[in-house]
């Protein structure tokens, strides 16, 4: 016996929300998707993201015609989806410290990944969630938006990012749902050198990406982001750059002041990091990222009528490349549960209970690990003990990093 009445309200049209909608559409489950931004890629800041252990899950979620385009949005179109060792290098010498193994990895620009996931998905933009009400009968939910729009559904899925409005409803208290600031000065930059020789030089040794760790306890990251005119036109290649160190950021600094600060640190680096950062054009916009986290914990899912996925469920520091992979994993497991509801083989309450019983502990462990890893990677004396050195890019899966460190020492 099927349940064709199922209608899912998805809040947030980031990658996680869009993937949720792709899976629902593929399964024949009705959905509505709402996004507070006014358009798909309305924000100017760009960055790159790594997909590795979750790639098989992503392939299952996407419809065939969208899945076929995955390799075309790779930051490095020459490499596409590939396996190898991710280079972590010594900031001052440029020498390799370690290579972190990965299998079937894909690095993508956020904007292209989001655009791909949006193909064929109906999104209502400019919609900010104001309230969520639950029918006293125990069935159904009503979402109210700031423009007065009311939308009824079977359940609501919060895919609305680290500062999730849906999470506030789930926790019943904005304070309990609030993120904790990770005390780091983290900068992101999108750079085009407009110079073929410079662009080729900074990619010569590490064609896709690298992470440089400095003895002065900061990191410098570079990745190719896109090749607008192809591999044969390096003068138009675009790079994602990042630099970060522990300490509170100064919100009053302008782009030029941040650029000067970043270059002052880059001056003491070895190649290729030194030139990569010192050659950044003076008009480079140096964005400050607000890194925060929330340690996943049980919430009131209202008998399965509310749940969270992705950064709404487990926002984490980005220094082990896990965030997007867990988002994809969440969507995969949620869709499996909702497919059972749609077919009538399980109830909504049971499906969401089972989903959260796996996802919340997984999210809690990964957030805790990512916080620990972020601190260690920005302390030269502790980098070798960090989870990324000990565990690589593998999900934690109940793995106790602290126990492994103790056994190794």
Curated annotation (Swiss-Prot):
Q: Which EC class does it fall in? A: oxidoreductase
Q: Which SUPFAM superfamilies match?
A: FAD/NAD(P)-binding domain
Which keywords are on file for this protein? FAD, Flavoprotein, Monooxygenase, Oxidoreductase
Q: Which reaction does it catalyse?
A: 3,6,7,9-tetrahydroxy-3-methyl-2,3-dihydro-1H-naphtho[2,1-b]pyran-1-one + NADPH + O2 + H(+) = 2,3,4,7,9-pentahydroxy-6-methyl-1H-phenalen-1-one + NADP(+) + 2 H2O
Q: What happens when the gene is disrupted?
A: Loses the ability to produce phenalenone, and accumulates prephenalenone as the predominant product.
The enzyme's E.C. designation:
1.-.-.-
What GO annotations for molecular function exist for this entry?
Answer: FAD binding; monooxygenase activity
Q: Give the source's domain of life in one word.
A: Eukaryota
InterPro entries, A to Z: FAD-bd, FAD/NAD-bd_sf
Q: Which Gene3D superfamilies match?
A: FAD/NAD(P)-binding domain
What cofactor is this protein dependent on? FAD
Name the positions where FAD binds: 35, 50, 110, 311
Q: What PANTHER family does its record include? A: FAD-BINDING DOMAIN-CONTAINING PROTEIN, MONOOXYGENASE, FAD-BINDING
Instruction: Please give the family membership noted in the entry.
Output: Belongs to the paxM FAD-dependent monooxygenase family.
Q: Which function does this protein serve? A: FAD-dependent monooxygenase; part of the gene cluster that mediates the biosynthesis of phenalenones such as herqueinone, compounds that have been reported to treat tumors, bacterial infections and/or mycoses, and rheumatic diseases. The non-reducing polyketide synthase phnA synthesizes the heptaketide backbone and cyclizes it into the angular, hemiketal-containing naphtho-gamma-pyrone prephenalenone. The product template (PT) domain of phnA catalyzes only the C4-C9 aldol condensation, which is unprecedented among known PT domains.
Name of the protein: FAD-dependent monooxygenase phnB
Organism encoding this protein: Penicillium herquei
